[in-house]
Each structure stands twice: as C-alpha cells, then as structure tokens.
C-alpha cells in the first residue's frame, strides 16, 4: 500500500482516496468546445418557458436589504436545442452591480437584458422576499420593524408587458364573532394568514405606495394588526379593538375585496385567509377571486 505524506494537504487527500487528473483528449478552451445548446435543427416544438428557479440574490426592498428568491425564464424557438443558462446569471449580475432595487421598473430592465443576451422574444421573472417596514405601537408609538412576504411577477413579449402582479402575505389577528356572541365574556382569537395576489394594470404606472395600500387593506379590515412591540397600554388597545371588530375568515376576505376593488390601477385579485384556529386542531380558510 502506498504511503502518503500526511503532513501535507495533498497527501491527506490522496490518503482519503483522491487521485491525480488524467491526461484528457477533449478541448480545454471555450472556442474549441462543442456548444450543444446552440445546435440548430428541427427540435419539434417551441418551448414557452425554460430557465432557472430558486436563485438567491441580495435585493433592496425600499430601505432594507433582503434575500430575493428568483425564478427566471425565456422562450425557446423550435429550431434551437437549449438556452445558455449562464447568461441568466450574467444578466442579473449586470443589474446587481448597479444596485438591484426590487420594483417593476428594475425587473423590466433585467428582462430586456435577458432577452438580448438569450436572443429570445419573451421572458419572465418571479421573485419573492421579506419586505421590512417601520411599525409603531398603537398607543405608546414605539417604533420597531414589521415584515410581510412579497412576490413580484413580471413577463414581457418583445418590449410589451404581458403579466404584472404582486402577492403579499401578512399576518393579522381575527376574533371569532360566534365565540363573542355566545359567551358571557371573552372570545377566542387567533393569528390569521392573509394572502393577496393583485393583478396590476399592465399599460399604466401604479401608484408609488401600492404595497402600503394593499397591506393596509389586508390589516385594517382584520380584528387587529400585529405589532412587534406592545406595552401595557398598547396591549389593552389591541385586545379591545379585536373584541370590537370580530371577523370570520369570510368577513375578512370580503372586506379586503371591497377596498381593493376601488383602486383603478388594479385589474383583479385573488384573496385567501387562513386562520390558525386556537380552539381546534384544524385551520379555517376562505378564498375569493375577482376580475374587473
């Protein structure tokens, strides 16, 4: 058995099974290598979407940096075997070097760059991340950082937007109207998870504070908002407000819809509320879809 010098890293590697590279016969320079993806012939079908998922990249959402989880895709013509996926990362990196602000204008520019690099007519992106914002306690006005999950979706054909949407998931308090009605005192309440997917007007700019307006519709119609910091006067206010505003899941999604339908920059929306029931082992949920 061969003895290796265990005092060196290379010796230890070989001791644990590493071997020297073989003398290869295939090209080692890019220009000499076969580019299978660029093969052109009849491959039977055009592909609507091909790309990458679960790409994690730093992004800025308003004042805070967070981790964005991206899904990118482009079309693929029938006479092309595949796409060059490394060009997707190159397109993202180009815009990251300029500071990757997570908004529709930036995503549009990334997709246009992607189309050029990939030589394709259509492209799309979905990216999700934590949206952080200031949240003040209701009585003592103490500032802390709240958060919600946001997902942007954008797709373009040539230079025209074909899909423009944003999804926000936030947590609220819901107090049971039935429990309040039948009980001598108190009522059970729980955390509700509200998800709103908004289909935005593709042909016009949305208002600057669209995320805040959507989140306000989700939270203000609940029994109570959730706060990072609550002192005793705040807790009293939150508890009493919830009791004054009981909500079934059905109530909540209808009230949210009534607010959203008034915005002229919204073409439609999907709403779901899921209550993590405090007196059951199951959850309660309700869904609603609306298109103008």
Curated annotation (Swiss-Prot):
- MF terms (GO), sorted A to Z: GTP cyclohydrolase I activity
Q: Which reaction does it catalyse?
A: GTP + H2O = 7,8-dihydroneopterin 3'-triphosphate + formate + H(+)
**Keywords noted in UniProt:** Hydrolase
> What InterPro entries does the record tag this protein with?
GTP_cyclohydrolase_FolE2 (IPR022838), GTP_cyclohydrolase_FolE2/MptA (IPR003801)
Metal-binding keyword on record:
no
According to its UniProt record, this protein's enzyme class is hydrolase
What function is annotated for this protein? Converts GTP to 7,8-dihydroneopterin triphosphate.
Q: Which Gene3D superfamilies match?
A: Urate Oxidase
Q: What is its EC number?
A: 3.5.4.16
Spell out the family assignment given in the record's similarity comment.
Answer: Belongs to the GTP cyclohydrolase IV family.
Instruction: Provide the taxonomic classification.
Output: Bacteria, Bacillati, Bacillota, Bacilli, Bacillales
Q: Supply the name of the protein.
A: GTP cyclohydrolase FolE2
Please name the pathway.
Cofactor biosynthesis; 7,8-dihydroneopterin triphosphate biosynthesis; 7,8-dihydroneopterin triphosphate from GTP: step 1/1
Q: Which gene encodes it?
A: folE2
């Amino acid at each position: 058995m061969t003895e290796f010098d265990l005092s060196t890293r290379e010796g230890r590697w070989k001791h644990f099974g590493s071997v020297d590279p073989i003398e290869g016969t295939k090209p080692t320079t890019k220009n000499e290598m076969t580019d299978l993806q660029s093969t052109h012939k009849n491959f039977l079908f055009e592909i609507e979407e091909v790309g990458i998922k679960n790409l994690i990249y730093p992004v800025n959402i308003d004042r805070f940096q967070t981790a964005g989880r991206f899904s990118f895709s482009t079309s693929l013509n029938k006479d092309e075997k595949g796409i060059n996926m490394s060009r997707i990362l190159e397109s993202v990196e180009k815009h990251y070097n300029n500071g990757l602000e997570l908004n529709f204008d930036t995503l549009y520019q990334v997709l246009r760059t992607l189309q050029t690099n990939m030589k394709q007519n259509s492209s799309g992106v979905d990216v999700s991340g934590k949206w952080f914002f200031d949240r003040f306690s209701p009585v003592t006005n103490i500032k802390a950082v709240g958060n919600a999950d946001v997902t942007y979706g954008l797709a373009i054909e040539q230079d025209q937007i074909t899909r423009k949407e944003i999804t926000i998931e936030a947590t609220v308090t819901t107090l049971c109207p039935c429990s309040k009605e039948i009980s001598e005192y108190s009522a059970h309440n729980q955390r509700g998870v509200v998800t709103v997917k908004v289909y935005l007007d593709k042909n016009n700019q949305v208002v600057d504070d669209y995320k805040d307006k959507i989140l306000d519709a989700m939270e203000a119609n609940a029994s109570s908002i959730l706060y990072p910091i609550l002192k005793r006067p705040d807790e009293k206010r939150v508890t009493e407000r919830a009791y004054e505003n009981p909500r079934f899941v059905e109530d909540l999604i209808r009230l949210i819809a009534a607010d959203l339908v008034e915005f002229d920059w919204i073409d439609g929306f999907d709403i779901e509320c899921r209550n993590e029931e405090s007196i059951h082992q199951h959850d309660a949920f309700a869904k609603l879809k609306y298109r103008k």
